[in-house]
Amino acid sequence: GIPANNSSDPRHSAFADAEFSPGSDGSISLWSNMLGLAATFSPETVEEFGRIAREEYRALGLATALSPQADLGTDPRWYRYSSTFGPEPRLVTDLTRAYADGFQTDPTAGGWGNGSVNAMVKHWPGGGSGEGGRDAHYGNGKFAVYPGGCYEQHKIPFLEGAFKLTGGTEKASAVMPYYTISY
């Protein structure tokens, strides 16, 4: 047969109604969105969320999480702002690392194992800098802007967070690029 890799956008926030319908098995756990998790200032809490979500994803037959969203939320007008860990590079880096470690690290294997869920970090090279807060999923949001020349800052959560995990998997397994023209 043809191998399948079922994936999902985040589904644990209060808006967890897009694809998952609770059946006789009960419901999936509900957590704050990413910005709410960031408000804890706790990589340990975010990693614990990742471990719980990993188990639930595997139970649902999901092998890849289309997350974490490692974008620096530099423009609060962006409608995806609440899906970020906020605007502060160090905090976003630490929480991105914790999130990916929680999803990917199978404790029985000390790294990759049957319980692992791939973390697809997004949106390279940083989607939170859309011109005027506009989103790149639409034509009017095709340009990323980096006021003050802070392009390099937007890459920090990827280069120092998602690609330098502390768990046995070492780095996020996948990267989702963004649709912007980044300059």
Model-derived features with residue positions:
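Glycoside hydrolase catalytic-domain context in secreted enzymes
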Residues: G1-Y183
